[in-house]
Amino acid sequence: MTETTENVVITIPDKTSFTFHEAATSPSEGEEFVVGHFRELTVKISGSSTSREIKFYAVDENGEKTALSGTNKTDFQLGSSTLNTNEYWDFDIAGLFKVMFEVVSVTGDVTVKGIVVS
């Protein structure tokens, strides 16, 4: 998408990837993604962990976390956390400030990566 302001042309990317956790082996809040102009997020949870719990959050300008529900792409169930791995989740993030995926517990390693689109 391209926006023009007077004589300045600004190109806004339509799609980008982001890593929340890379092979995390201990509980962690991970990286927060600043939503900006993006509207949709697809997250892949993978890794060799034999058990894990991941909670999904929206984070406001004051750093306050609120549970964020997403749709599991396998069974189309809504959820704000998961105990599974090797799955994809979709989130509507339009209007949010930041999103994060907290690894509450893990045995082994877990990776959480996302692709956002505007």
Swiss-Prot record:
Recite the lineage of the species: Bacteria, Bacillati, Bacillota, Bacilli, Bacillales
- Name by which UniProt lists this protein: SPbeta prophage-derived uncharacterized protein YomS
Encoding gene (name): yomS
Report the source organism: Bacillus subtilis (strain 168)
